[in-house]
Amino acid sequence: NSMERVEELRKKLQD
């Protein structure tokens, strides 16, 4: 799911 990937990337940016 692309949403899954987006969530992962957003998490990385949050750091």
Curated annotation (Swiss-Prot):
UniProtKB keywords? Antimicrobial, Chitin-binding, Fungicide
Any Gene Ontology biological process = killing of cells of another organism
Q: Does the keyword Metal-binding apply?
A: no
Please list the GO terms describing molecular function.
Answer: chitin binding
Q: Copy out the induction comment.
A: By ethylene.
Similarity annotation: Belongs to the parathyroid hormone family.
As for what it does, the entry says: Has antifungal activity against A.alternata, A.cucumerina, A.niger, C.gossypii, F.oxysporum, F.oxysporum subsp melonis, F.moniliforme, T.cucumeris, and V.dahliae. Has no chitinase or agglutination activities.
Please identify the protein, giving its name as recorded.
Answer: Chitin-binding protein HM30
Q: Which organism is it from?
A: Hydrangea macrophylla
Q: What is the lineage of its organism?
A: Eukaryota, Viridiplantae, Streptophyta, Embryophyta, Tracheophyta
